[in-house]
Amino acid sequence: MQSVDVAIVGGGMVGLAVACGLQGSGLRVAVLEQRVQEPLAANAPPQLRVSAINAASEKLLTRLGVWQDILSRRASCYHGMEVWDKDSFGHISFDDQSMGYSHLGHIVENSVIHYALWNKAHQSSDITLLAPAELQQVAWGENETFLTLKDGSMLTARLVIGADGANSWLRNKADIPLTFWDYQHHALVATIRTEEPHDAVARQVFHGEGILAFLPLSDPHLCSIVWSLSPEEAQRMQQASEDEFNRALNIAFDNRLGLCKVESARQVFPLTGRYARQFASHRLALVGDAAHTIHPLAGQGVNLGFMDAAELIAELKRLHRQGKDIGQYIYLRRYERSRKHSAALMLAGMQGFRDLFSGTNPAKKLLRDIGLKLADTLPGVKPQLIRQAMGLNDLPEWLR
């Protein structure tokens, strides 16, 4: 039976980030992942699932030694952001230079980030990648946790990290309750070709019951879109003919970049918010979507998860250096308190933002238009908003 210090269940982006961060710490780490990593084809069309990687996540990925690998594959730097309310005067825009930054963030395909982290973990002598591996049983002992895999093999760990996604099996097994709400929206994602170049600006428009984001890709005429719509409308748009879809898209987007045409399949998935009542318990810590999921309004989901990883890496290294038991809940509380606070703030902010920007009530529309206008013109507001979006208010000590 193999024994490790830390068993990470789920080899997605956040789970692998924790593993890579613990490399060289003296802790033995195993990552259990259900799927084997496929090689990335350099000439493959852009994947539909992308993330807006902010400055905080960039700092983490740089410290983990994978950022250059990501940039060398496919990542699109963006220098500006525009947000507006359709058919009204509400509008706010940001650009990096006026704020004193070289860029605001990068749009990166999730598969590119994942591949870079997987490679890094694979090259590390103190990380064992077990894939394909599926958990069948978990038993929480006083001093260690016993994990049984579907193939019958067993593993013990002093700490188990649940990085197994929004429907976390580990979270359920640990009987951690979940606050759950349905945003009553579905997200449609696709790759779009624009007539005019996107100029490395991320754009977001609020229209009636929907929110449409255009995220600039490496090709100056390609954008990845996230279109948040009612479930019925999202289904209708997914099944619509290309002409019909393009027409609706151009109307919703105010023809900002000339005629836009869909270039890929259209995927739809439901949007739900989740918040675990605990982010840790005896011999267990939750990270990423296993702990929280938010509305992908600004592509911020993975940034929140990466900051969980950054905080947990620092905490586990500190405990290990001090000779403390890394699986004791009393020691994991510090991680839990810090990340629950950050996640709650982000969830509340997103919920408030969504409530304000959904619906066509004239009074609400006027209120949000005035809010956008004031944020755009009042001194001192934009720098704060940008710092928040870049994740610079939420950096653990070791990344500052």
From Swiss-Prot:
Q: Name one GO biological process term.
A: ubiquinone biosynthetic process
A GO cellular component annotation in the UniProt record: ubiquinone biosynthesis complex
> From which domain of life does this come?
Bacteria
UniProt enzyme class? oxidoreductase
Binding-site residues, FAD: 49-52, 297-303
The record's catalysed reaction(s) read: 2-all-trans-octaprenylphenol + NADPH + O2 + H(+) = 3-(all-trans-octaprenyl)benzene-1,2-diol + NADP(+) + H2O; a 2-(all-trans-polyprenyl)phenol + NADPH + O2 + H(+) = a 3-(all-trans-polyprenyl)benzene-1,2-diol + NADP(+) + H2O
Any one GO MF term held by the record is: FAD binding
Give the free-text miscellaneous remark of the entry.
Partially complements the C5-hydroxylation defect of S.cerevisiae cells lacking COQ6.
Q: What is this protein called?
A: 2-octaprenylphenol hydroxylase
Species this protein is from: Escherichia coli (strain K12)
Q: Which gene encodes it?
A: ubiI
